[in-house]
């Protein structure tokens, strides 16, 4: 296995585990956000099921990434979450400091996918 891909999987798993747990236990304070970002989050929070489901999914998928079990499944489930994190931080909270971690998460996801490309290749096969 490619070492960069494996390290990327572990780092991505740790990021999702830490921020998933933070979403439940809130050990990191939420930074001040622009009004547009607060409006967006307020809409999501008004659906009381959304954040517990999201954070539970992040924790479960991070455990899969860290354990090495069902990694392609975890990467596929986390892909739209990662893209939405990137879009939220680049569009609703502009600034290089806000986009650094989401960009790193996208790059880590791409690197982690490398070891599992034969599995993902089947998704793009013409039948």
Locate the predicted segments by residue.
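Interfacial helix-start motif at the membrane-water boundary
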Residues: 42-60
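Extended, low-polarity transmembrane helix blocks
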Residues: 1-28, 52, 67-127
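Peri-membrane helix termini and adjoining interfacial loops of integral membrane proteins
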Residues: 26-39
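Generic transmembrane alpha-helix motif of multi-pass integral membrane proteins
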Residues: 60-66
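Generic secondary-structure boundary/loop-capping signal
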Residues: 37-42, 120
């Amino acid at each position: 296995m490619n070492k960069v891909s494996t390290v990327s999987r572990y780092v991505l798993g740790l990021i999702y585990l830490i921020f998933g747990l933070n979403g439940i236990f809130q050990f990191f304070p939420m930074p001040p956000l622009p009004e547009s970002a607060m409006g967006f989050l307020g809409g999501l929070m008004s659906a009381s099921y959304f954040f517990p489901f999201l954070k539970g999914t992040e924790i479960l998928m991070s455990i899969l990434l860290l354990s090495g079990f069902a990694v392609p499944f975890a990467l596929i489930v986390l892909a739209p979450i990662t893209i939405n994190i990137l879009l939220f931080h680049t569009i609703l909270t502009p600034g290089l400091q806000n986009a650094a971690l989401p960009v790193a998460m996208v790059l880590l996801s791409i690197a982690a996918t490398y070891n599992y490309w034969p599995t993902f290749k089947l998704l793009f096969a013409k039948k």
